[in-house]
Swiss-Prot record:
One annotated GO molecular function: rRNA binding
One GO term of the biological process aspect: cytoplasmic translation
Source species of the chain: Histophilus somni (strain 129Pt) (Haemophilus somnus)
InterPro entries found in the cross-reference section: Ribosomal_uL6-like, Ribosomal_uL6-like_a/b-dom_sf, Ribosomal_uL6_a/b-dom, Ribosomal_uL6_bac-type, Ribosomal_uL6_CS
Function: This protein binds to the 23S rRNA, and is important in its secondary structure. It is located near the subunit interface in the base of the L7/L12 stalk, and near the tRNA binding site of the peptidyltransferase center.
Domain of life: Bacteria
Assembly description: Part of the 50S ribosomal subunit.
Pfam families: Ribosomal_L6
Gene Ontology CC: cytosolic large ribosomal subunit
UniProt keyword Iron present: no
HAMAP family on file: Ribosomal_uL6_B (MF_01365_B)
Descriptive protein name: Large ribosomal subunit protein uL6
SUPFAM superfamilies: Ribosomal protein L6
Gene: rplF
Keywords: Ribonucleoprotein, Ribosomal protein, RNA-binding, rRNA-binding
Length: 177
């Protein structure tokens, strides 16, 4: 059995979990998330805990049980507390601003980039060089942050580009004559 799957997922009082066959729905103050659990994983709900165990005789059942436990734990944390990702824009003239549900980025191209945020993700710009993303869905917020970063990755000579707030960009030395 997976080491991750051995630990049960504790459910806070403010979170409601509904298990319907292999479909697990988690409801909290930040919204509602649902996910289909793999057939090789058996889920049991006891009071305020969810336990995950692999079904016997199925290949990869151990790995799937650990994965399912980690995904459901992220869902419970997301609907209860939510997730945030911070991005920084480094470079002369690099700016970000919100216009409704659209994030407008000026990243040194000849045109501004309009990035439409998907449902479930909100963004705010405390300054022109900072973007703060908030969502209950950990996978979705990570994908949106990666998409925004992909427009202009940090380059290794000057460090210009879009980076995560906690990202350390390894700098190269310029060519010497």
């Amino acid at each position: 059995m997976s080491r991750v799957a051995k630990a049960p997922v504790s459910i806070p009082a403010s979170v409601e979990v509904k298990l319907d066959g292999q479909l697990l729905t988690v409801k909290g103050k930040n919204g509602e998330l649902s996910r289909t659990i793999h057939n090789s994983v058996e889920v049991k709900q006891d009071n305020n805990q969810l336990t995950f165990s692999p079904r016997v005789g199925i290949a990869n059942a151990d790995a799937q049980s650990g994965t399912a436990r980690a995904l459901v734990n992220a869902m419970v944390i997301g609907v209860n507390e939510g997730f945030t990702k911070k991005l920084q824009l480094v470079g002369v003239g690099y700016r970000a601003q919100m216009k409704g549900n659209v994030l407008v980025l000026s990243l040194g191209f000849s045109h501004p980039i309009d990035h439409v945020l998907p449902a479930g993700v909100t963004a705010e710009c405390p300054s022109q060089t900072e973007i703060v993303l908030k969502s209950a869905d950990k996978q979705l917020i990570g994908q949106v942050a990666a998409d925004i970063r992909a427009y202009r990755r940090p380059e290794p000579y000057k460090g210009k580009g879009v980076r995560y707030a906690d990202e350390v960009v390894r700098m190269k030395e310029a060519k010497k004559k």
